[in-house]
Amino acid sequence: MRQPGGGRVDVLLDGASVLDSPLSLLSPALEAAHLFFDSPANARHRIEIRTLSSGKVRILGIVAERIAPGVVYDVLGVNGARASRILGWNQPALAEVLAARKPDLIVLEYGTNEITDAGWTPTSYQRLLAGILRRLHEAAPQASLLLIGPPDRSDLAIAADKMSSMIVAQRRAANAAGAAFWSSYDAMGGAEAMNVWTGQGLGQADHVHLTRAGYNRLADYFYQDLTLAFGNAAPNRRRNPTLDRP
């Protein structure tokens, strides 16, 4: 990232610089910087980033891709995440990064942490999510958007109607923004489902997070609903599909 007080760096691939001259990260304002270079395929490589001055250096990420058909999955997992945090990010830089990556699909999953926030209301939450989805659409108009709702949790005395209100707010926000919506909560079985899943070894002892087997089960449910939504699979009679297409 270029920024005030930014330093200079060199980038090396297998010990050799990929630059004709050092890269300056100095800029009057924060802005994303991108560097692209090729490497021989089907081999291991070592990438080094060396600072050449005492200036600030911030690396937002490294992407290694093959020029071949397939799926590239970029993941950004943040502990204690809330949708509102997106609004605190540098919006021009976020837009630049999304424009450079050109995603075909952007997936957001929120709700587990917000459900315990004091003063939470369905109306304000729906408005927040709809605004975030619109911003992402403006930054990456070619991308489809998918909002995933939270799984059930049974560690706190959260009324089932409050969780249901959150799912309704998320579904309405997705519909308003032309995004798809999938409910983990409903896929699990709704209220008190976490107790059942934990008893089956699918939920962790905190009754908030799933085990590896639980997340695999939920992923299978999502895949079933996704293929059903596109007419490529027969419905699972044991479950009701929970994916809303835009």
Please report, for each region that a protein language model flagged, where it lies by residue.
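Short C-terminal domain-edge/linker segments immediately following a structured domain
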Residues: 27-32, 79-80, 103-109, 137-141, ...
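A generic secondary-structure signal
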Residues: 96-97, 135, 225
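Residue-level recognition of the N-termini of beta-strands and the immediately preceding loop/turn
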Residues: 71, 143-145
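Extracellular/periplasmic catalytic domains that process cell-envelope and extracellular macromolecules
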Residues: 40-42, 99-100, 139-140, 174-176, ...
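Conserved N-terminal glycine/acidic-rich loop preference
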Residues: 102-115, 123-139, 146-184
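Catalytic His-Asp segment of secreted/periplasmic serine-dependent ester chemistry enzymes
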Residues: 91, 151-246
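Generic detector of short alpha-helix boundary/capping microenvironments
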Residues: 37, 50, 137, 162, ...
